[in-house]
Amino acid sequence: MRFFVSCAKGLEYLLVDEVLALGAVGATATVAGVNVEGGLCDAQRLVLWSRLASRVLWPLAAFACADEDALYAGVAALPWVEHVLPGQTLAVDAHVSGEAITHARYAAQRVKDAVVDTLRDAGVVRPSVDVEHPDVRLNLSLRKGRATLSVDLGGRALHHRGWRQAPHAASLKEHLAAAVLLRAGWAKVYAEGGGLLDPMCGSGTLLIEGALMVADVAPGLSRYADPDAISHVSVAERPVLLPSRWRGFDVVAWEALVVDAQQRARRGLAELRPVLHGSDIDPRALGAAFANARAAGVQDAIEFVVAGIDVLPAVFEPHGVVVCNAPYDVRLAANPGLYRHLGDALRRVVPRWRAALVCGSSPLAFATGLRAGKKYQFFNGALECVLIVCDPVVPLAREAGGAQALSEGAQMVANRLRKNVQRLKKWRMRAGVECYRVYDADLPEYAAAIDVYQEVDGARRLFLHVQEYAAPASIPEGDVRRRRHELLAAVRAVFDVSVAQVALKTRQRGKGGSQYGCFAQRGEFFHVCEHGALLRVNLFDYLDTGLFLDHRPLRARMAREAVGKRFLNVFCYTGVASVEAAVAGAAATTSVDLSSTYLHWCTDNFALNGQGGVRHRLVQADALAWLEAERGQYDVIFCDPPTFSNSARADDFDVQRDHVRLLRAAVARLTPGGVLYFSNNFRRFRLDVDAVAAFAQCEEISPVTIDLDFSRNTRIHRTWLLWR
């Protein structure tokens, strides 16, 4: 069974790891959540044990939903007497996106009406509404004409732990605190004898979550504890209530999970070492922190001290982790000076410890003066935050002489890179572009194309793809090597990346089959995001990365036009255009390529986005021969052939020689009103306008398919729109 576990944006891949560790059969990350394969017991285990999830949603039904009548009918068709007992209370949460029904509250009301009317018609006492603590909480997701109705097995947002007795204005939500601790590797540090320090602990969220994590206490034990027992009974002994009274809830399995969790909590709390330290300048905040720690049952493991960051509490552990949720919104008056003082204090008191600091922005993180080995982004409510991890706080000198200064040539390249980064910044922020071209032989003597790839999971590392153009034979080899080294030095300095994060390739005229040859044996794939689709790329092992950045705006245009339609992608490569069309809502996609390597890659891209199955067909075939034999019709076709290719399994292909034949076959597959996008990057290509006019209307649209980052090289590709 597939069910959905939601989370805050930025935590998806941590949640995948947690879900799998808790026994799920499979898990696939998507935006703000994870699709999970498993049974009801697996879902209930997540309700009890997940430290990262927001909600666990068990599906009841999914159906087409064009309007409010279809919504009502789809919900009313369910056998509600099998789900809700007479007299129970009910709540409905709704999330709608781009639908005929645009108001979530109205959608929730229609769901509630359908449930109540169905039960009344069956002669059952109608449920009443309780939005805070219902017996059964339903969740409606309405997206792209499709409704999914689920039971919220947790009954409430799972970031609530049950121990927060005294909230504080600057509190970090508990599931985000758990994410910070996981990114910091706190559990491993604790196992090795280390400590935990929070110099701005506020109401103690990070420290309490840290204590419960290493004590192996399930979050659900306190969340669902009998409220009357919280103040005077140990967390491992409190009666635990059902999170949901949905009739399908497996009570026996839940009780067994609780018994096991209580046994683990008893052992963990008994062995918990007092190695957690917190300080804050506000005595009221510390009062709240101690009350919360007592409610969580970990007050004896945490030392709280009233102190500013200039006077950090003494720590006796030789190594450990500093965690901190520093002020960063307007209400809390964030300022770079505070961050600078924090960095100074950590360098002075715990220079060899690891630090994981939540900052409001990259500039505030930079103000600490600490060198971040890793950076992550996530949302604390509506606020976007940056988490930096510095290991250690004061790094050991890299070399005896420190970092080498850039040469004059490298400095020139670095200046141009910084200028380009700044020039592209507003456009990138507005367009949500994370992978882009930052340099393309701007300085002729440093002839290379440089692309930036932002990892979306794991450590969210930056990778640089440097494609060096082949130097003329008249340039001495010594000069070629020097300029290459200067270029790479500038790249590493500007983007603050290691050698391992830079892929260097020398671009030469391609030979048939070379696109399949390996350049390295690293096998290092990572994920990036474009237009809401997750994509698998590899910068090191192949000639190309798996993502042609120059076609970015064309892919967006085709995805918009393919909503609810049939999309065909010939010479599909890794299937990025097909995947983005599927994510946007294409009714069906067909992707054709001769390479099994690329089709496997395409399959992985579909799976990353929870797509696939019979609606999304992959075909291994010679594209031209397949088109001429195909009889299906398509609304949107993308044709991006190579300049030249040869294969033992297919005829040689030359785009200049064969394009009329190719386009005639592709246009023949268009539905009435359908469109064909034809693109190629052969610089000397000439479209045979007269021949094409015999079977299609044709318009060149190249300028609108070039984004700002490729504006220096507007001939990177040419694109035509064809229709009948």
Curated annotation (Swiss-Prot):
It comes from the Bacteria. It is an enzyme of class 2 (transferase). Keywords: Cytoplasm, Methyltransferase, RNA-binding, rRNA processing, S-adenosyl-L-methionine, Transferase. It holds the Pfam family THUMP. The keyword Transferase applies. Residues 42-153 form the THUMP domain. InterPro entries: 23SrRNA_methyltr_KL (IPR017244), RlmKL-like_Mtase (IPR000241), RlmKL-like_Mtase_CS (IPR053943), RlmL_1st (IPR054170), SAM-dep_methyl-trfase (IPR019614), SAM-dependent_MTases_sf (IPR029063), THUMP_dom (IPR004114). GO terms for cellular component: cytoplasm. It is found in: Cytoplasm. One of its GO terms (molecular function) is rRNA (guanine-N7-)-methyltransferase activity. The keyword Transferase applies. It catalyses: guanosine(2445) in 23S rRNA + S-adenosyl-L-methionine = N(2)-methylguanosine(2445) in 23S rRNA + S-adenosyl-L-homocysteine + H(+); guanosine(2069) in 23S rRNA + S-adenosyl-L-methionine = N(2)-methylguanosine(2069) in 23S rRNA + S-adenosyl-L-homocysteine + H(+). Its EC number is 2.1.1.173, 2.1.1.264. Belongs to the methyltransferase superfamily. RlmKL family. This is Ribosomal RNA large subunit methyltransferase K/L. It comes from Xylella fastidiosa (strain 9a5c). The gene is rlmL.
